[in-house]
Regions:
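Catalytic machinery of carbohydrate-active enzymes
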Residues: 1-235
Length: 235
């Protein structure tokens, strides 16, 4: 806020805590009772934008992305009759990661029910995915590190469900209107949750109140993640 105030722009606007409102020409107060996306849309309303209707996050893969995804599925011998469930087990914030062995157990359960399971994620997730799949009794498809955002969106569109941590790829799945099951621990799903009706949010029961005043980036306990059970996710 201070740096912005030092610039010579004619109009400064944004959303932040009220103690910083003096740095803005048009100020939208931070409201943690509403979703962050709606809060940012309020900034536009303060600027006079009348039509705030939206379809949520949308990513539009190009033809090359659909071709990339289709070639990948062909290489994995996936047909139109196969039912795919995707898994995204990574997150840039370590405290948001559900244990890999539980993802493995969930994947095995769905594989036993006739689904093909596929693990997504970026290059940074490859070690985690290797650990998770090492626990599995069935053989999944590994797409980790294979796709950039456009290809990932096209590939995720082929899935009937994505099971995911709170992460960037979760929002990519949402952008393709794929139903998701999302695990939420230290971050507040009311503020940062999936911006879609096609989502089931799983939280620890009973919930941990350790991050009531803000998300922790390190924690010696992580009850918010470890209390979430395989049964909750599968259900």
């Amino acid at each position: 806020s201070f740096i912005d105030a030092m610039t010579s722009v004619k109009l400064r606007t944004g959303t932040t805590h009220k103690i910083f409102k003096w740095f803005w020409d048009v100020f939208t107060p931070l409201d943690r009772s509403m979703h962050a996306a709606d809060m940012y849309l309020d900034v536009l309303q303060q600027l006079g934008v009348q039509d705030l209707s939206n379809n949520g996050l949308e990513i539009f893969p190009g033809e090359e992305h659909f071709l990339e995804a289709e070639l990948f599925w062909q290489e994995q011998n996936i047909t139109d009759q196969d039912k795919l469930i995707g898994f995204n087990i990574g997150s840039a914030v370590p405290t948001k990661r559900w244990p890999p062995e539980r993802f493995a157990e969930v994947a095995d359960i769905f594989a036993a029910r006739g689904y093909k399971t596929v693990f997504f994620g970026g290059p940074m997730d490859e070690e985690m995915v290797a650990e998770a799949t090492g626990y599995m009794q069935t053989r999944p498809i590994i797409a980790t590190g294979h796709f950039a955002i456009g290809g990932l969106a096209a590939a995720m569109r082929r899935c009937c469900l994505i099971i995911t941590n709170d992460s960037g790829p979760m929002h990519v799945a949402i952008s393709q209107k794929v139903p998701i099951v999302a695990m939420y621990g230290p971050s507040n799903p009311k503020l940062y949750g999936p911006y879609t009706k096609e989502a089931v949010i799983v939280t620890a029961q009973p919930p941990c109140q350790g991050c009531a005043d803000g998300m922790k980036h390190s924690c010696d306990d992580l009850q918010c993640m470890t209390r979430m059970t395989v049964e909750q996710v599968v259900k």
